[in-house]
Amino acid sequence: MAENPIYGPFFGVMGAASAIIFSALGAAYGTAKSGTGIAAMSVMRPELIMKSIIPVVMAGIIAIYGLVVAVLIAGSLDSPSNNYTLYRGFIHLGAGLAVGFSGLAAGFAIGIVGDAGVRGTAQQPRLFVGMILILIFAEVLGLYGLIVAIYLYTKQ
């Protein structure tokens, strides 16, 4: 019972919660920031709205990363009497924090790049490819967190 304390599952629940909360915060910021850029750009160039929606979609994908890890963690939560160790709780917390904080950072990057990129593309269409490349690098930050979280999750 010493390695299965009653508070062990608390850390697992905190891992699941932090995975979805922080990645959703990043996705929300990225969506809001790039969405304001799209709204400002569409006043002058309404024909570019559908082309400029890419940053919003990429920001939404960040939340899916957190959702995947949160569902994985929540699916393996169990009571301490059913051999849910403190080690497992810490692993789940680490996995949730990894994907959550990397999703938060990626969402911030996508929002800032998406806002500036959409506004710049409205004035100079050749900036579109550069914006997409930078957005891909920002999205990969969230993907790194997902990879680390899944790797940690499999260590239980």
Curated annotation (Swiss-Prot):
Major subcellular location class: membrane
Gene3D superfamilies in alphabetical order: lithium bound rotor ring of v- atpase
One Gene Ontology cellular component annotation held by this UniProt entry: proton-transporting V-type ATPase, V0 domain
CDD domains: ATP-synt_Vo_c_ATP6C_rpt1, ATP-synt_Vo_c_ATP6C_rpt2
TM region positions: 8-30, 53-73, 93-114, 127-152
Pfam family, one: ATP-synt_C
Site location (Essential for proton translocation): E139
Alphabetized GO MF terms: proton-transporting ATPase activity, rotational mechanism
Keywords: Hydrogen ion transport, Ion transport, Membrane, Transmembrane, Transmembrane helix, Transport
Residues exposed to the Cytoplasmic side: 31-52, 115-126
Localization annotation: Membrane
Segments on the Lumenal side according to the record's topology features: 1-7, 74-92, 153-156
Disulfide bonds: none
Cross-referenced PANTHER family: V-TYPE PROTON ATPASE PROTEOLIPID SUBUNIT
Family: Belongs to the V-ATPase proteolipid subunit family.
Binding partners and assembly: V-ATPase is a heteromultimeric enzyme made up of two complexes: the ATP-hydrolytic V1 complex and the proton translocation V0 complex. The V1 complex consists of three catalytic AB heterodimers that form a heterohexamer, three peripheral stalks each consisting of EG heterodimers, one central rotor including subunits D and F, and the regulatory subunits C and H. The proton translocation complex V0 consists of the proton transport subunit a, a ring of proteolipid subunits c9c'', rotary subunit d, subunits e and f, and the accessory subunits VhaAC45 and ATP6AP2.
Functional description taken from the UniProt entry: Proton-conducting pore forming subunit of the V0 complex of vacuolar(H+)-ATPase (V-ATPase), a multisubunit enzyme composed of a peripheral complex (V1) that hydrolyzes ATP and a membrane integral complex (V0) that translocates protons. V-ATPase is responsible for acidifying and maintaining the pH of intracellular compartments and in some cell types, is targeted to the plasma membrane, where it is responsible for acidifying the extracellular environment.
Protein name listed in UniProt: V-type proton ATPase 16 kDa proteolipid subunit c
Source organism: Manduca sexta
